[in-house]
């Protein structure tokens, strides 16, 4: 590790560019408090890959070693991180990475939203509401899509997370109109009374029996508290957001936002930025693992998505420069072999790679996802005003 320590002494920052890639829901084993969340025994990665997989590049970065597979000439620095946020969802997982852990969690509505809230939404939008249950997104549009097409009513549903989702057929409610409806609902639910983390637009197309959700999803979050992205921005370090990162942080302290259609599109955009020139943080989320396969409990599809990522990963690695750092992590688990359809409370991986790394090494488990954000601040020589998390670079000196 001495090469890293020497580099840090010589220049203001060790790496000019940091690529932080979140493999949404790729957990690596039950967290110490998993039983409290009903997730004992969950292990998204291990249960997905089984004994037949083609993940050679991720294997060299140390990912598979984190779930008990044999170490094979690793090139990356790898470890697990423990969640300390009070949830097991996208927003809180990403928040924790960036130094935010809320003492009072957002509210969830496992039995549906209060009728007075539904009434307010109907009055404000001029449309009736159907659904109002906790449900799978694909399942509810199959069940209520035809009624929605006949009546124009909004399909409203939730999940185990703090979300209010509104599904609408693009021919019944055009996407831009759906976005405006979600903006209206965001204003209604922004206060402490309902305390809903995200309002999500869920457009879909097709006919009864063959409805399909489109990539035009849009999340409406609340402004996050002070976090790593704010400190980077304050110090002149830009953040490029790929995927749903800009939605999660409500576009706050983000210089460039890029939407993606799917994981492959996200990887191609990552590779394009790696080939180009920029300085700062590129923060990306690849969501197919969670949205298409985890919630649907599709182990085969989940493994295929991992193998697709593994296929494109060497192209990204090839285009990294000596002063680039790649960090691959996750925000929570979503074991496709587990009961139910919800996220699972798990450790997440932290894989670190740069062309200057000579050999791989496993580091001890991190006590919080916030160590990622603390490391990014340390890299750019920015004091950690958040007082949460410790720089992983400190381990390089041991």
Where do the PLM segments sit?
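Feature captures the catalytic ectodomains and active-site-proximal regions of enzymes
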Residues: 2-398
């Amino acid at each position: 590790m001495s090469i890293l320590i020497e580099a840090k002494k010589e220049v203001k920052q060790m790496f000019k560019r940091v690529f932080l890639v979140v493999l949404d829901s790729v957990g690596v084993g039950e967290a110490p408090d998993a039983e409290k969340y009903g997730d004992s025994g969950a292990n998204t990665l291990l249960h997905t890959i089984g004994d037949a997989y083609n993940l050679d590049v991720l294997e060299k970065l140390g990912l598979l070693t984190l779930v008990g597979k044999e170490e094979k000439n690793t090139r990356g620095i790898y470890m697990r991180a423990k969640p300390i946020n009070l949830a097991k969802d996208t927003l809180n997982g990403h928040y924790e990475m960036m130094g935010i852990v809320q003492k009072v969690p957002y509210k969830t509505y496992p039995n549906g939203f209060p009728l007075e809230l539904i009434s307010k939404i109907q009055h404000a939008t001029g449309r009736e509401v159907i659904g109002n249950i906790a449900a799978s997104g694909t399942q509810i549009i199959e069940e209520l899509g035809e009624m929605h097409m006949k009546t124009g009513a909004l399909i409203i549903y939730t999940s185990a997370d703090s979300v209010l989702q509104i599904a609408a057929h693009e021919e019944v409610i055009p996407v831009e109109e759906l976005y405006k409806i979600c903006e209206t609902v965001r204003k209604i639910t922004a206060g402490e009374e309902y305390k809903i983390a995200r309002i999500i637009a869920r457009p879909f197309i097709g006919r009864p029996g063959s409805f399909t959700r489109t990539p035009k999803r849009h999340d409406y979050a609340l402004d996050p508290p002070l976090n790593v992205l704010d400190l980077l921005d304050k110090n002149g370090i830009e953040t490029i957001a790929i995927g749903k990162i800009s939605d999660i942080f409500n576009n706050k302290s983000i210089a460039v936002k890029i939407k993606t259609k799917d994981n492959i599109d996200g990887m191609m955009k990552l590779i394009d930025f790696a080939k180009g020139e920029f300085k700062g943080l590129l923060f990306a989320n690849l969501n197919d693992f969670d949205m298409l396969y985890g919630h649907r409990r599709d182990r085969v599809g989940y493994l295929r998505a991992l193998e697709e990522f593994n296929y494109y990963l060497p192209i990204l690695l090839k285009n990294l420069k000596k002063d680039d750092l790649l960090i691959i992590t996750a925000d929570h688990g979503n074991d496709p072999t587990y009961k139910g359809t919800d996220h699972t409370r798990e450790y997440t991986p932290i894989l670190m790679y740069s062309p200057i790394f000579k050999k791989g090494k496993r580091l001890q488990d991190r006590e919080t996802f916030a160590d990622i954000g603390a490391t990014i601040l340390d890299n750019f020589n920015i004091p950690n005003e958040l007082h949460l998390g410790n720089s992983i670079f400190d381990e390089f000196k041991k």
